[in-house]
Amino acid sequence: MAKEKIRIRLKAYDHRILDQSAEKIVETAKRSGATVSGPIPLPTEKTIYTILRAVHKYKDSREQFEMRTHKRLIDIVSPTPQTVDSLMRLDLPSGVDIEIKL
């Protein structure tokens, strides 16, 4: 596993939970002897939904809601078998989506 790299992408609606999860992953990887690059903040994805306030007419009266998806990227360079094992056992909050590429 000498020249391999693990790329972890984290997504969440709440940036505080996302940053805590990223810190847990970085701390766990460093403790097991791997070199870590990140967490790198990626652009926040903003989705806006516009709805009419009234049911029948008054099209000028609208309301907008937005959903922000925050993202972070972590690269683990030269992971050891102990690193992979400790990352598999790591417990993260349910609001964080994790994508792992080897």
Curated annotation (Swiss-Prot):
Domain of life: Bacteria
UniProt keywords, alphabetically: Ribonucleoprotein, Ribosomal protein
A GO term, aspect molecular function: structural constituent of ribosome
GO cellular component, one term: ribosome
Signal peptide positions (record): none
Gene3D superfamilies: Ribosomal protein S10 domain
Cell cycle as UniProt keyword: no
GO biological process: translation
Matching PROSITE patterns: RIBOSOMAL_S10
Function text: Involved in the binding of tRNA to the ribosomes.
Oligomer status and interactors: Part of the 30S ribosomal subunit.
Record NCBIfam families: PRK00596.1 (NF001861), rpsJ_bact (TIGR01049)
Family: Belongs to the universal ribosomal protein uS10 family.
Designated name of the protein: Small ribosomal subunit protein uS10
Organism classification: Bacteria, Bacillati, Bacillota, Bacilli, Bacillales
Gene encoding the protein: rpsJ
